[in-house]
Amino acid sequence: MHMSVLCLGEVWLELNAATAPELTEAFRAQTGGWGAGFCRQYAALGGQAALLAQLGADPFGRKLAARLARDGVDCSLLCFTDAFPTPVVFTGADTALPYRAHTAGLALGPEQLEAAPFRGVSAFCFSSAGLVDSPLRLAHLKALAAARDAGALCCYLPRLAQAAPYWPQREALCQTALQFLDRADVLFLEESDLLLLFGSRELRTALFALFTGHVQLIFFYKKDRILAFTRSVMASAAKKDQSPALVLYRMEQMGIHVIDLPQLREHVLEQLLSNDANTTECQGLPY
């Protein structure tokens, strides 16, 4: 089956409470993990999204896989292990208590990845929670190489504020994120990412540092606006429902590939940022 987007990350059982976890007696079970959430959003738009992750061969792992499949996510690349359990995270009142050390998700190593699933994929996406020091971080490096060899767009969504509770030290998180920024073709950034990485929410202070390595396109999500930059042009739009999943879905529908990124013009960026939820086609070439 052709997959337009492939995400690498973790899937965990998220037990959510209305109050702080230590104060509650009832939790609501949810599917957690950035990659799982992104794939579900992409599938809801009508796109094909596959999740590359490892779960425990336990009831929790099987339940999460069934939920993802029910939501339209391609689960053919999920793997299961008897050696580690499915991770569990307790959340509530802006608090996250992760139990993921020595669990299946972080134990996914590069030796378990093959190049074949990356062929024909339009984009490979990853975030920061899974870059913690573990076999999974090494798997990210191999996946990036495989995606680049296959000609897929490499997209990094740092989401540092959301990833911070899942790292032992915030400084290590930021240092690792800086090491991965220039490995991506496309960055989806938030103001909190800039604050943690560069000490400022102002993008202009960081643009020079960001446009290095493979980076050709940056989407910057502010409180009320979204900005898009290539190395030569920019566009902006009022922020509404233009999630990274929607923007990437539009890129896939427009047929934008890695080789097209340096040539994108302002009108194409404007279509990608459009408030019109039905905007998925670009007339003519994308540049």
What are these regions (language model features)?
Residues 233-287:
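Conserved post-catalytic alpha-helical subdomain immediately downstream of the catalytic base
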Residues 117-119, 178-181, 212:
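A short, aliphatic-rich alpha-helical micro-motif
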Residues 1-73, 265-273, 277, 281-287:
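Glycine-rich phosphate/adenosyl-contacting loop at the front of the ribokinase-like
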Residues 48-128, 280-287:
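Conserved N-terminal subdomain of the carbohydrate kinase-like
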Residues 49, 75, 154-156, 188, ...:
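Hydrophobic beta-strand scaffold residues
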Residues 186-196, 206-236:
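Conserved phosphate-donor
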Residues 123, 128-204:
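Conserved beta-alpha-beta core of the PfkB/ribokinase-like small-molecule kinase fold
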